[in-house]
């Protein structure tokens, strides 16, 4: 009986620990996006392809990673034989808001030119994201 209770207690502890672990935001799925020209897009991340508007690209992802308590993913997008590095950066604890960046330096992946404001639920405003999240 004691062994059974001890096993049950251990199981409950493991379940509560797993439930308490902070899950990383997911890239996969459809994102509402806006660029600097205020043009709206749908960006859809799948396992190894990303669709930006009507254009499909192959990509590889490294992450999630964290820096300065922020979560980000490093992407390598392949287009016409050329590979370009990008970062999808989550500037808050929210899993619905992200910035699509082209880093100036691969050693500083969360610093660079913002290409798109991303939001899972609603249409983002590029310039309000710049003002709010890029300091």
Regions found by a protein language model. Give the residues of each.
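Contiguous, well-ordered beta-strand patches that form the walls/edges
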Residues: 35-42, 55-108
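Edge beta-strand at a domain terminus
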Residues: 57-63, 103-135
């Amino acid at each position: 009986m004691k062994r059974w209770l001890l096993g049950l207690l251990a199981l409950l502890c493991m379940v509560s620990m797993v439930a308490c672990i902070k899950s990383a935001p997911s890239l996969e799925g459809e994102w509402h996006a806006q660029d600097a020209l205020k043009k709206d897009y749908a960006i859809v991340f799948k396992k190894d392809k990303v669709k930006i508007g009507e254009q499909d690209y192959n990509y590889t992802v490294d992450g999630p990673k964290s820096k300065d308590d922020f979560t980000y993913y490093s992407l390598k997008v392949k287009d016409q034989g050329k590979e370009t590095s990008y970062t999808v950066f989550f500037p808050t604890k929210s899993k619905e808001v992200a910035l699509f960046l082209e880093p100036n330096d691969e050693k500083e992946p969360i610093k660079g030119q913002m290409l798109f404001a991303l939001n899972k639920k609603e249409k983002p405003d590029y310039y309000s994201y710049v003002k709010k999240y890029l300091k």
